[in-house]
Amino acid sequence: MMQRPFRPEEYSLKETSPHLGGGAAGDKLTTTYDLVEQMQYLYVRVVKAKDLPSKDITGSCDPYVEVKLGNYKGTTRHFEKKTNPEWNQVFAFSKERIQSSVVEIIVKDKDFVKDDFIGRVLFDLNEVPKRVPPDSPLAPQWYRLEERNGHKVKGELMLAVWMGTQADEAFPEAWHSDAASIPGDGLASIRSKVYLTPKLWYLRVNVIEAQDLIPNDRTRFPDVYVKAMLGNQALRTRVSPSRTLNPMWNEDLMFVAAEPFEEHLILSVEDRIAPGKDDVLGRTIISLQHVPRRLDHKLLNSQWYNLEKHVIVDGEQKKETKFSSRIHLRICLEGGYHVLDESTHYSSDLRPTAKQLWKHSIGILELGILTAQGLLPMKTKDGRGTTDAYCVAKYGQKWVRTRTIIDSFTPKWNEQYTWEVYDPCTVITIGVFDNCHLNGGEKANGARDTRIGKVRIRLSTLETDRVYTHAYPLIVLTPAGVKKMGEVQLAVRFTCSSLLNMMHLYSQPLLPKMHYVHPLSVMQVDNLRRQATNIVSTRLSRAEPPLRKEIVEYMLDVDSHMWSMRKSKANFFRIMGVLSPLIAVAKWFDQICHWRNPLTTILIHILFVILVLYPELILPTIFLYLFLIGVWYYRWRPRQPPHMDTRLSHAESAHPDELDEEFDTFPTSRPPDIVRMRYDRLRSVAGRIQTVVGDLATQGERLQSLLSWRDPRATALFVTFCFVAAIVLYVTPFRVVVFLAGLYTLRHPRFRHKMPSVPLNFFRRLPARTDSML
């Protein structure tokens, strides 16, 4: 199959010009939603009814209300045997899709065969009032029911009908006409919602010692360790080096705990009898509600806990309390750390857990999620492709989810959200997904919402008080290659409340103080981040509607640490991009030294002489040069936010087998021959890296051998040279030495020869430890 040619313009950022806030005309009724396009809706609030007539033979009434506008029809829930029901439900009809000039509200009596007509109320849309916040809500009124011929009948209906926008308070919970095909139990999964990340703490358990342990086997010295469990997190200490009944460890175990504290900390002291066989010598259970909280690095008081021993009597586990062993612990909840639950490269929040340590916010981030264009079909329904798209945005502890737009490749959300900003060097993440749970959350048979694409925007790359309106490409990487799924249009504004405070932040540490005073190891940070993301995804998946685990993991980049040949190549070329200016300077200096451009070389000679004669000008010259470069580049400063770059990511040039390897499970699920081939390829790459690392080590060892007398003749020569150089440099003015060294470096090619220099020859002859390698 021929691959479609790569076109970079498809994956580029495009500036847009939407009519934000209703445009510049007088139609702009509110400034609350000034980063989205205004959407008009007809709202119908059905509050309650009274004095409804009985229609059944039994003399009862099972009423419900049907709101009808053209081909759209929404119904309330029905009540059994109730003549004065209360519904308090809101219906919203998009003005773009209104096909009638009259809205009809019909009260019906639910029946087994055919629902009976009780009465109706009609409204002419031309007479419906307009209402936009911050106006007060429209007060509902009683309306007398009518027959189809216009005659009044018994019964009244309390209603409120108005024209409004998506800024209306009733909008999030309203029944929407574009979701008319969704059953009642699926409506919860399509509404917009705001979620909060649970408050996360690091739990530090300092296991100090135990006393008076009673082993089951008293003929041997016990090999004792402590096992700690918090929910599904399990850690253990090393085996105590003191094989006694009073072992000591003084070892820290770190966990992640989330408020409200539902799990208990369980510690058990165990004796390792043989591999795979351990005896529990005692256990204690500690509630986190009573654990002290620490805001700095000061030591808290330790505490002794009694160890309970459980024995099995007649098949039942009972507590044995003959003699109590004890364990010495220092436990605290660390409030001075920031619990990392997202990749450190894309952090959206850097504040410590304890709110007392938070600094004041420096600004407001506003995000308008407008529309999407050109979305691809994500699933098949009734024999045709369809997409039910929604967006999720995450910044700090606040997650937002837009409503789901049913069956549309160009969905319009026009929803606006705000966040407080505490640090500009943070990233907001916006993801677009396809909703696969429209038939009710539990009826989807384990379906997973499909990812359509993701956008990241770093706040420090934005100018303050400027509105950025762009169409961002939605790009996903599949085993078949890179694929554009469409575009999402966003409006972003970062407003700074104090420029001085924001500038001051650039001089502050990125993470809270405890990360530097009492740092965690790299392995601890990785393990704790994995536990934190697991807790966050579990908690948010229990919300209603749930923010499902696959969504949270995609937004938090859970699999970013997995091996990828493509990412390795991309990172290598990123390093080369960083080093390329240095390489260019080295090439330029080599051309100067070889007099490729005599005029430039002469000018460099003159500059060099000036700097030797006036060395106090060196640093001012360097900083002035950097200043001029920065001012010169200001004209070509980036005017657009950064976006996903397929060329930088090496996504368009990745080999299919490399992509298949990147999407492989862990552990692998591929056939043995493919795994063997990939292992051999990895060995080949690692072999080249091994050679480069070995060469670097060789050069370093040669430097060390200058004074090690490993080669006595070479060291004697070097020591003699150092003694002579010390005398010469002592009696010779420093400026003369620098001047002569510079002239020698910049000498004309006729005074050069192609053979290596004497110092280089000497250095290459020095011994290294490669001779001792197996």
UniProtKB/Swiss-Prot annotation:
Residues at which Ca(2+) 2 binds: 56, 109, 111, 116
Q: Which SMART domains does this one have?
A: C2
Gene Ontology terms, MF aspect: metal ion binding
Could you list this entry's UniProt keywords, alphabetically sorted. Answer: Calcium, Cell membrane, Membrane, Metal-binding, Repeat, Transmembrane, Transmembrane helix
Name the residues that span the membrane: 575-595, 606-626, 714-734
Q: What membrane topology does the annotation report for this chain?
A: Multi-pass membrane protein
Binding of Ca(2+) 1 occurs at 56, 62, 109, 111
Q: Which PROSITE patterns match?
A: C2
Using the UniProt annotation, give all residue ranges assigned to the region (Disordered).
1-25
The biased composition feature labelled Basic and acidic residues covers 1-17
Where does it localize? Cell membrane
Cofactor(s) listed in the protein's UniProt record? Ca(2+)
Q: Superkingdom of the source?
A: Eukaryota
Q: List the InterPro entries hit by this protein, alphabetically.
A: C2_dom, C2_domain_sf, C2B_MCTP_PRT_plant, C2C_MCTP_PRT_plant, C2D_MCTP_PRT_plant, MCTP_C, QUIRKY-like
List, for all copies, the residue spans of the domain called C2.
23-143, 182-305, 346-472
Cite the record's tissue specificity text: Expressed in roots, stems, lemma, palea, pistils and ovules. Expressed at low levels in leaves.
Q: What SUPFAM superfamilies does its record include?
A: C2 domain (Calcium/lipid-binding domain, CaLB)
Q: Tell me the Pfam families matching this sequence.
A: C2, PRT_C
Q: How does it assemble?
A: Interacts with OSH1.
Family affiliation = Belongs to the MCTP family.
Q: What is this protein called?
A: FT-interacting protein 7
Species whose genome carries this gene:
Oryza sativa subsp. japonica (Rice)
The organism's lineage is: Eukaryota, Viridiplantae, Streptophyta, Embryophyta, Tracheophyta
